[in-house]
Amino acid sequence: MNPAIDLNCDMGESYGAWRMGNDEAVLQFVTSANIACGFHGGDPSTMRQTVAAALAHGVALGAHPSLPDLAGFGRRAMQITPQEAYDLVVYQVGALAGVAASQGARLHHVKAHGALYNMAAKDAALARAICQAVRDVDSDLVLYGLAGSALIDAARAIGLRAAQEVFADRTYQADGQLTPRSQPDAMITDLDQAIAQVLGMVRDGSVRTPDGQTVALQADTLCIHGDQPDALVFARGIRLALERNGIAIQAA
C-alpha cells in the first residue's frame, strides 16, 4: 500500500487592515486548512471569508486556536493554567464552528497555534486540557499535534483521533522537537532541502537533525506555512514531489 499524507496550512491570519499570507493561492495545493480564530489573527470577517474559500476548494476545515496575543502573533509563551488552556480552546473552536455552521459545514480538526502548540507538545497537563476541550466541543474532531509529542499521547488517552504532524520548512532537534525559531538553523528556505526532508519523513518515517542525527517519527499530516515568502513555491513543489513519488494526498 502506498503511503498517504495530508497537506495542511495555517491561514485566515489577517486581522483588519493588516494582511498575512497568500491563502487563496495556497488553497489549491493543500487538503486541510488551519483557520485562525481571533486570538493571534483572524477577525470575524476574515474567518468567514477563509471558511468560504476553503470550502470552495474542497479543503477540510480546522480551528487554529492560540494564546491571546495579537501583538506577538501568538508566538510568545505565557504562563497559563490547564483550565485557562481548556477555556481558550473551547472559546475559539466554538467560534469557528459557528462560522462553519453558518455556511452549512462542520469542522474536521483542531491544531493549536504557535506558542500554545509548542508548550503543549512538552507539557502533559496543558496537552490533556487542550485535548479534553476539543473532545468536549466535538468528539469527532481530529487533533493535529507534533509527531511523538505530549499532544498525541493526550489525545490517544481519551479516545480522540490524532494526526501526527511534521514540518517541511522547520528543522528538528534530537528529542523530536522543532528547533526554536530564535536559532539560526530553525528554518529551511531551500525547496530541494525541504522536499528531501518531506520524502524522508513520509516514506522512511525519519528526519535528520542539523547535526546529522536520525530521529524516528510518524507523518500523518504535513504543515506548509502560508506566511513564508516562498509559500506558494514550496506548496507547489512539495505537492508535485509527493505525487511523482506515488504518495497519496488526502485529509487526515
UniProtKB/Swiss-Prot annotation:
Keyword Amino-acid biosynthesis: no
EC number: 3.5.2.9
One Gene Ontology term of the molecular function aspect: 5-oxoprolinase (ATP-hydrolyzing) activity
Keyword Transcription regulation attributed: no
GO terms of biological process kind: carbohydrate metabolic process
Entry keyword set: ATP-binding, Hydrolase, Nucleotide-binding
Catalytic activity: 5-oxo-L-proline + ATP + 2 H2O = L-glutamate + ADP + phosphate + H(+)
UniProt xrefs under InterPro entries: Glyco_hydro/deAcase_b/a-brl, LamB/YcsF/PxpA-like
One Pfam entry name: LamB_YcsF
Subunit structure: Forms a complex composed of PxpA, PxpB and PxpC.
UniProt family annotation: Belongs to the LamB/PxpA family.
HAMAP family in the record: PxpA (MF_00691)
Function: Catalyzes the cleavage of 5-oxoproline to form L-glutamate coupled to the hydrolysis of ATP to ADP and inorganic phosphate.
Protein name, entry field: 5-oxoprolinase subunit A
Gene: pxpA
